[in-house]
Amino acid sequence: MGRGRIEIKKIENINSRQVTFSKRRNGLIKKAKELSILCDAEVALIIFSSTGKIYDFSSVCMEQILSRYGYTTASTEHKQQREHQLLICASHGNEAVLRNDDSMKGELERLQLAIERLKGKELEGMSFPDLISLENQLNESLHSVKDQKTQILLNQIERSRIQEKKALEENQILRKQVEMLGRGSGPKVLNERPQDSSPEADPESSSSEEDENDNEEHHSDTSLQLGLSSTGYCTKRKKPKIELVCDNSGSQVASD
């Protein structure tokens, strides 16, 4: 049969209590020693009996373990306190953020309502003075828009005038350059024209030369005809009269 489970509760019998304490104390010290050896751990054990007697065990110096325990505990407590403070600050910050968020939402709603009223909407809850103020605000906005529009148009007109003036100046400069080029290239063209001309390239000049040659030939022919006519006339006029004269010998001799 197995061992029955012992109910964990205070032992009322004093003698039985002392016997149980002695057995379990020795077993606890043995387990602590085995733990320090097997796991290379620093173990400290302090036991106070019900009669006030102290029992202790430490794998190393007890003061060193207690000092380390105190430092670690203090650090842990400080860390816990710091974390607690951070949590408090975070909660306060969250509350501030929430309040700021609420105020921002209210401001956003107010601005959206003002925009809608500027558009001529959501006017039901406005009083007469509020409507007059809104009307004045809209009139000022309208005047500002008109002034800005006029200024933009004036700026565009001024830019157009500047561009027109610049274009006229450039046109005048180009015209002067063209006139100067025309004056400088005129005589050069006249001088070079006879060198570049040829019968095939200049039909008008060739035709004029042919006309001049024809005129010269016609003039020479006319002169030749006139010369021949005058020569014949002169020959006709100066033709001597031949008379036959018989001399004593009986022969005929021609005489003028």
From Swiss-Prot:
PANTHER family (alphabetical): SERUM RESPONSE FACTOR HOMOLOG
One GO CC term, this protein: nucleus
InterPro entries cross-referenced by the UniProt entry: MADS-box/MEF2_TF, MEF2-like_N, TF_Kbox, TF_MADSbox, TF_MADSbox_sf
Deletion consequences: Altered expression of MIKC* MADS-controlled genes during pollen maturation. Early flowering under short-days conditions (SD) when combined with AGL15 disruption.
Highest taxon, organism lineage: Eukaryota
PROSITE patterns given in the database record: K_BOX (PS51297), MADS_BOX_1 (PS00350), MADS_BOX_2 (PS50066)
Chain ranges of the K-box domain: 94-184
An example Gene Ontology molecular-function term: DNA-binding transcription factor activity
Record bears the keyword NAD: no
Expression sites (tissue/organ): Mostly expressed in pollen, roots, flowers and siliques, and to a lower extent, in stems and leaves. Expressed in the endosperm and in developing male and female gametophytes. Also present in seedlings.
Subcellular locations according to the entry: Nucleus
SMART domains found in the cross-reference section: MADS
Biased composition (Polar residues): 222-232
Function: Probable transcription factor involved in the negative regulation of flowering, probably through the photoperiodic pathway. Prevents premature flowering. Downstream regulator of a subset of the MIKC* MADS-controlled genes required during pollen maturation.
A Pfam family of this chain: K-box
Bias-annotated ranges (Acidic residues): 199-215
Chain residue ranges for the region called Disordered: 179-232
Keywords assigned: Developmental protein, DNA-binding, Flowering, Nucleus, Transcription, Transcription regulation
A GO biological-process term: positive regulation of transcription by RNA polymerase II
Keyword Cell cycle part of the UniProt annotation: no
CDD domains, alphabetized: MADS_MEF2_like (cd00265)
Domain MADS-box per the UniProt entry, residue ranges: 1-61
Protein name, as recorded: Agamous-like MADS-box protein AGL18
